[in-house]
């Protein structure tokens, strides 16, 4: 359960920063100076990110599990579709598909058999996390500072780095920190889980598109 939620968090944060809406939200009244600085940093990062309803590309992931000497490596492709969610299509070492939508987290094997599935209707924590992180996909820049202490900086003309430290007790059950870096696209996500596991996801050849291609649309079915 905790590993699934952590996977959901990293996937949704990636989607939030990859396929965001063009609008922005003002910082709420009474926001502290620290939260205001975080909001301004997020706004600056979003201005550097490409604005597109669909982002697709390839990825590699290296996951280190506490107690195991060798990391687990996987690779494949991803699709982020505004209003639909995120799909991770793992191609190596074993084919599988991870779908993250506003209402569901589902892992499916190559033969169509469902490995596991979490639905927001049955898991209140999933609904809460979905609600928060998919709000970010709507460019509500007031959301992240409410749940994370945010540190970071702009790098050169296009680059940026962010570190997210959970303030919310629920998030802290699963996460220690998330580190992201990128330019016009998210390029790397580092996730440190509370139970000691960690993941590094590198995104390769991301491309912005106006609509889902037919093969990608089928991944959301």
Language model: regions and residue ranges:
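Bacterial N-terminal signal peptides
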Residues: 7-16
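N-terminal leader/targeting segments and the immediate start of mature chains
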Residues: 21-58, 64-69, 218-221
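Flexible, surface-exposed loop/linker segments and immediately adjacent secondary-structure boundaries
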Residues: 113-160
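Short, surface-exposed coil-to-beta transition loops
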Residues: 73-75, 101, 172-175
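Short hydrophobic/aromatic-rich beta-strand segments that constitute the beta-sheet cores
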Residues: 59, 80, 86-90, 105-107, ...
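Positively charged n-region of N-terminal signal peptides that target proteins for export
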Residues: 1-4
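An acidic-aromatic
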Residues: 77-128, 199-200, 205
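Gly/Pro-enriched, hydrophobic low-complexity segments
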Residues: 141-221
């Amino acid at each position: 359960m905790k590993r699934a939620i952590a996977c959901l968090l990293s996937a949704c944060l990636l989607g939030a920063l990859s396929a965001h809406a063009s609008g922005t939200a003002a910082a709420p009244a009474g926001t502290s100076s620290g939260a205001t600085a975080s909001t301004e940093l997020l706004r600056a990062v979003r201005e550097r990110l490409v604005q597109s309803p669909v982002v697709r590309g390839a990825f590699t992931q290296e996951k280190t599990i506490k107690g195991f000497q060798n990391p687990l490596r996987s690779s494949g492709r991803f699709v982020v579709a505004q209003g639909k969610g995120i799909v991770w299509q793992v191609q190596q070492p074993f084919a599988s598909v991870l779908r993250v939508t506003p209402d569901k987290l589902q892992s499916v094997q190559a033969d169509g058999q469902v490995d596991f599935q979490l639905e927001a209707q049955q898991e209140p924590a999933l609904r809460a996390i979905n609600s928060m992180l998919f709000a970010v996909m709507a460019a509500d820049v007031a959301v992240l500072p409410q749940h994370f202490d945010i540190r970071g900086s702009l790098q050169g003309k296009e680059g940026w780095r962010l570190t997210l430290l959970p303030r919310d007790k629920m998030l802290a059950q699963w996460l220690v920190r998330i580190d992201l870096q990128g330019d016009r696209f998210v390029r790397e996500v580092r996730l440190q889980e509370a139970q000691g596991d960690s993941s590094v996801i590198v995104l390769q050849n991301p491309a912005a598109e106006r609509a889902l291609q037919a093969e990608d649309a089928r991944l959301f079915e």
